[in-house]
Every structure is written in C-alpha cells, then in structure tokens.
C-alpha cells in the first residue's frame, strides 16, 4: 500500500503555489477546488489545476484534487476537467453515504470511457465531514474499489456538533476512531484532518503523535513546514529498525527449521508482532527518525 503520510493542500486559485508545490516533497499534493476557492474564481482555478496536472514534474508525485460536490454547479465540471488531465485521486467532499461514493464512481467511469483513460485508473478519497457521514463510515469505506481511503474533515463536523475545536481534540475522538475502524475493516487507508494553526509547531506535533498512535496512515496539511515534522514523526528510530530486523530474522529462521513457534530472546513472537516489524522496515525506506 502506498505511503501517504502527508497530503498538502494547495489552493487551486493560487497560480504561484500550483507552479512549484512539488518542491516541498509531500507524499501527495492535494489541489483544492472547493473551500479554498472563491465562487468568482471557480472556473479559472479549474483551468489552472488542469494545467498543473499535466506538468511533467507533477507526474513524479501523487496528485489529488478536492472537487466541488457533484450536486453543485461546479462538481461535474471539476471532475470532467481533472480526470481528463490525469489526476491520480479525486477527493470527494462532504461524503455522507455509500450512494455519494457510488454516484462519484459512476461519473468518473463515464468520463474515463469518454476520454479513453484506463477504466478504474482514477482513484477516490472520501472526506467525511458531518455526524451523518460518521454514522455511515463503514458503508462508505466499502462502497467502491476506487477508494484508497477515507478522511476526516473536522471543521464542518465540529460545527455540526455545536461545539468548537480544542487543543486536546477530545471532540474529535469518536469521529477519528469511527473513520479508522471503518478504513481498517475495508482494507483502505485513514487520514486525519488538518491542524489549522500553522505557527504552533508544538500543538501540531502533539496532535500528529496522537493520530499516529491511534493508527492513522497520514494527515492533511496546510503548510509545507509541517511536512518534514510529520515525516520524521512517522519514521522509525534506528533502534526500532534493528529490533524489527531481529524479529524478521527470527521468523525466517523458525520457518526454515519448521518450528511452529517463533521466539526471540526467550519471548514468543506472534504474527501481529511480525507484521508490525514488516511495517517498521517499510517505513524505514523513507527515512530514519532523528532523535
């Protein structure tokens, strides 16, 4: 499964950022045609994003576009433009049901047919931003083979709860756990919401550590400075890597000997621990954490 620790939001109407945001090296670039774009700039932003998607340097990084809802006047126009331009992943906003996913899947299928793009090559990411969506997270996660993951959109969700975001994020715990459980059950990835105070590095790291501990695959970002911080947090330490190698070596040796039980230093090593060691080694390919 592709490494997607960081998804950097880039406003679709910001020509300067569109021209060079690949230099920050997030795992995915997410061009935004929805909330970050004023109504009067929707059409020009769509053209800018379509042009950026065809830039050779954006072929070397995964591209995601958050389109406007299909039931808006801009949604289908956005979708037609970005699918034809070769976007890797379409981010659905405000997903509240499996039917929302199916409708988007069908629309993408028709566009792929019309432009000659390989069927199924356009992937989807469903953003859940309401209490209704959270209650339907499991159905949403299983709704389409195009889905690479589901993501939490906190601002609308918290407003609908009739509360506000706190430094501790306690108001998001149920939503985060619901999204994570649904994603894991469906075998797809789970992504956390943005941390909106770009100047609060300590607060960002605290929240990022929390979602990593919960089990999230990555996080949406609004500031390039957050990318390195997040990648370093998700990276294993050298000590982690060395222990993971010992676990894998013990498992390989046990299999070679036909032993039914894997042990290391007198302790039994079961399948979940071996799987965790494999994940550590996979993450280590992208860097070792600075301690």
Curated annotation (Swiss-Prot):
Key word Magnesium present: yes
Assigned keywords, A-Z: Cytoplasm, Lyase, Magnesium, Metal-binding
UniProt GO molecular function: citrate (pro-3S)-lyase activity; citryl-CoA lyase activity; magnesium ion binding
EC number(s) given by UniProt: 4.1.3.6, 4.1.3.34
Catalyzed reaction equations: citrate = oxaloacetate + acetate; (3S)-citryl-CoA = oxaloacetate + acetyl-CoA
Example GO biological process: acetyl-CoA metabolic process
Positions annotated to bind substrate: 66, 129
Cofactor note: Binds 1 Mg(2+) ion per subunit.
Residues annotated for Mg(2+) binding in this entry: 129, 156
InterPro entries in the record: Aldolase/citrate-lyase_domain (IPR005000), Citrate_lyase_beta/mcl1/mcl2 (IPR011206), Citrate_lyase_beta_bac (IPR006475), Pyrv/PenolPyrv_kinase-like_dom (IPR015813), Pyrv_kinase-like_dom_sf (IPR040442)
Pfam families xref list: HpcH_HpaI
Cofactor(s) demanded: Mg(2+)
Family classification: Belongs to the HpcH/HpaI aldolase family. Citrate lyase beta subunit subfamily.
Function field: Represents a citryl-ACP lyase.
Assembly description: Oligomer with a subunit composition of (alpha,beta,gamma)6.
Alphabetical list of NCBIfam families matching this protein: citE
This protein's name: Citrate lyase subunit beta
Organism: Haemophilus influenzae (strain ATCC 51907 / DSM 11121 / KW20 / Rd)
Organismal lineage: Bacteria, Pseudomonadati, Pseudomonadota, Gammaproteobacteria, Pasteurellales
């Amino acid at each position: 499964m592709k490494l997607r620790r960081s998804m950097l939001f880039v406003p679709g109407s910001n020509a300067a950022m569109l021209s060079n945001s690949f230099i920050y090296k997030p795992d995915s670039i997410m061009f935004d045609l929805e909330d970050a774009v004023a109504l009067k700039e929707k059409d020009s932003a769509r053209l800018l994003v379509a042009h950026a998607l065809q830039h050779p340097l954006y072929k070397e990084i995964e591209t995601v576009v958050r389109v406007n809802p299909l039931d808006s006047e801009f949604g289908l126009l956005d979708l037609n433009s970005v699918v034809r331009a070769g976007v890797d992943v379409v981010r659905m906003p405000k997903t509240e049901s499996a039917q929302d996913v199916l409708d988007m899947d069908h629309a993408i299928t028709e566009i792929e047919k019309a432009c000659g793009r390989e069927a199924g090559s356009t992937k989807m990411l469903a953003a859940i931003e309401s209490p209704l969506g959270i209650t339907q997270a499991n159905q949403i996660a299983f709704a389409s083979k195009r889905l690479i993951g589901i993501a939490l959109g906190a601002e609308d969700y918290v407003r609908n709860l009739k509360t506000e975001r706190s430094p501790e994020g306690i108001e998001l715990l149920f939503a985060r756990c619901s999204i994570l459980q649904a994603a894991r059950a469906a075998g797809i990835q789970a992504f956390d919401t943005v941390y909106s105070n770009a100047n609060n590095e300590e607060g960002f790291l605290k929240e990022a550590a929390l979602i990593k501990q919960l089990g999230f695959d990555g996080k949406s970002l609004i500031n390039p400075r957050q990318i390195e911080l997040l990648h370093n947090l998700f990276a294993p330490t050298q000590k982690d890597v060395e222990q993971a190698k010992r676990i894998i070596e013990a498992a390989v040796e046990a299999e070679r000997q036909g032993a039914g039980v894997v042990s290391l230093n007198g302790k039994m090593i079961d399948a979940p621990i071996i799987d965790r060691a494999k994940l550590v080694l996979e993450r280590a390919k992208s860097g070792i954490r600075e301690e």
